[in-house]
A protein has these predicted regions:
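Short aromatic-glycine motifs in intrinsically disordered, low-complexity regions
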Residues: 81-87, 134-141
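Edge beta-strand at a domain terminus
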Residues: 131-133, 139-154
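Bacterial N-terminal signal peptides
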Residues: 7-15
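Central antiparallel beta-sheet cores of small beta-barrel/beta-sandwich binding domains
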Residues: 32, 37-38, 43-117, 121-123, ...
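Positively charged n-region of N-terminal signal peptides that target proteins for export
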Residues: 1-4
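N-terminal helix-cap/turn-to-beta initiation motif at the start of protein domains
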Residues: 21-34, 144
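C-terminal terminal-subdomain/extension
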Residues: 123-127, 132-133
Length: 154
């Protein structure tokens, strides 16, 4: 009986991280907030907001290095495939538009994420990890890359 109780306790404790993860992923509006990401020497902050239609948008609002070293001026979105957006400052780029919550999978997706370094858009899905970070997986033609956004309090 003692072994059974120990095994049951171990199983219950093993399930705790999964339940904590699914709790954060179980409500669509949990994604709303501010996040930061560091990739190599690049660092930026993003704010996720809710659109009037119930979808979500992620927009850069801060960059570690907003100045283009070649020009000495604010860095612009020069690789954007939409030529009308190439004069937009990089610290104002909308990375994700119309992100939808998919309750059956407890993820956000059915949207594109924009990569300003490459000037491409990719399919994106997002979910919270056990440690609270937001995991965003972008895929183009089956090739994927994952970035992590850490929640910030300001």
């Amino acid at each position: 009986m003692k072994r059974f109780l120990i095994a049951l306790t171990a199983v219950l404790f093993a399930m705790l991280p999964a339940s904590a993860q699914s709790a954060k992923n179980s409500s669509a509006d949990n994604i709303i907030g501010k996040y930061e990401s560091v990739q190599g020497t690049d660092a930026y902050k993003v704010e996720v907001t809710k659109n009037a239609d119930g979808t979500y948008k992620a927009q850069i609002y801060w960059m570690k290095d907003p100045i283009d070293p070649r020009t000495g001026k604010k860095a612009l979105d020069v690789k954007n495939p939409d030529k009308s957006l190439r004069d937009r400052p990089c610290d104002q780029i909308v990375l994700i538009q119309n992100l939808k919550y998919i309750p059956a999978k407890k993820v956000w997706g059915d949207a594109k994420i924009y990569d300003p370094q490459r000037g491409i858009k990719a399919n994106v899905t997002a979910h919270f990890l056990q440690d609270g970070r937001l995991s965003l997986k972008a895929t183009v033609l089956g090739i994927g890359e994952t970035v992590y956004w850490t929640p910030v309090k300001e």
